[in-house]
Design a protein with these regions (language model features):
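Accessory carbohydrate-binding/adhesion or oligomerization-edge regions at the termini
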Residues: 1-47, 123-127
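Accessory beta-strand-rich segments of carbohydrate-active enzymes
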Residues: 4-17, 54, 58-161, 166, ...
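A generic "cationic amphipathic patch" detector
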Residues: 22-23, 33, 42, 81, ...
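Surface-exposed, low-complexity/disordered Ser/Thr/Gly/Pro/Asn-rich loops and linkers
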Residues: 47-55
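Beta-strand-rich binding/interaction modules
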Residues: 94, 174-214
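Short, solvent-exposed loop/linker segments at the N-terminal edge
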Residues: 167-175
Length: 214
């Protein structure tokens, strides 16, 4: 799965009413590059509901918008947004439709855009609600404070969450491992394929090769 940074050319502004889905872009929108901490620029004050937990700064509700061009071939591929961290409750809209949401400010999450894209210009709008205080025991930051990536692949692919490897047994120079490779098929029919697995050491030397049909 191809992965590229998706941090450039975002617009940002504060949302006064997080429950009013207004699709215009206000004049005061700022052009930013992610990662972006929307809380750090707030003026600290003694009466903050968070107190010293977040540096006497209040959280607010934020909006991020980015447009990008989808070519015709992109409509027949998986296009997934990977958010490494967004604080706090996050709602992701693609061309005005809710494509995904996430309610934990510290964990990575994915939003599949395939069913919402169209040829030409597309709009991604991320609404981050961080106005419900207090919600942290330390400085959390606010908004899209970590990297965002665009993942793209064929409709038959290894899951965006990736493979897992676990050491089952380890003794001297012998090890037995268990590898899990989740495969997703978004095609309209079943597909037969070969899965090839290579295990390498820290220097890139191939230690094990396994290939089998599915």
């Amino acid at each position: 799965m191809k992965q590229e940074l998706f941090n450039d050319d975002w617009l940002f502004w504060y949302d006064e009413n997080s429950f009013a889905l207004v699709w215009n872009i206000p004049e005061q929108a700022q052009k930013i590059t992610l990662p972006h901490d929307a809380m750090i620029s707030e003026t600290p004050y003694a009466e903050s509901r968070n107190g010293n937990n977040t540096g006497f700064r209040d959280g607010k509700n934020y909006v991020y918008v980015k447009t990008f061009i989808a070519e015709e071939e992109d409509l027949y591929r998986e296009n997934i947004l990977k958010f490494e961290g967004s604080y706090m409750n996050t709602f992701v809209y693609v061309n005005g439709q809710l494509a995904g949401k996430h309610h934990n400010g510290y964990t990575t999450f994915y939003v599949n855009m395939k069913d919402f894209l169209h040829f030409g210009e597309n709009e991604i709008r991320v609404q981050v609600r961080n106005g419900a205080m207090s919600n942290s025991r330390w400085y959390s930051g606010g908004g899209l404070y970590r990297d965002v990536y665009l993942l793209s692949s064929d409709l038959l692919h290894v899951s965006a969450a990736g493979s897992k490897i676990r050491t089952v047994e380890l003794e001297n120079d012998f090890a037995r491992i268990e590898v899990s490779v989740p495969i997703e098929n978004r095609k309209c029919k079943g597909i037969q394929f070969d899965l090839k697995l290579m295990v390498c050491d820290k220097d890139g030397k191939i230690l094990l090769v396994d290939q089998r049909p599915y």
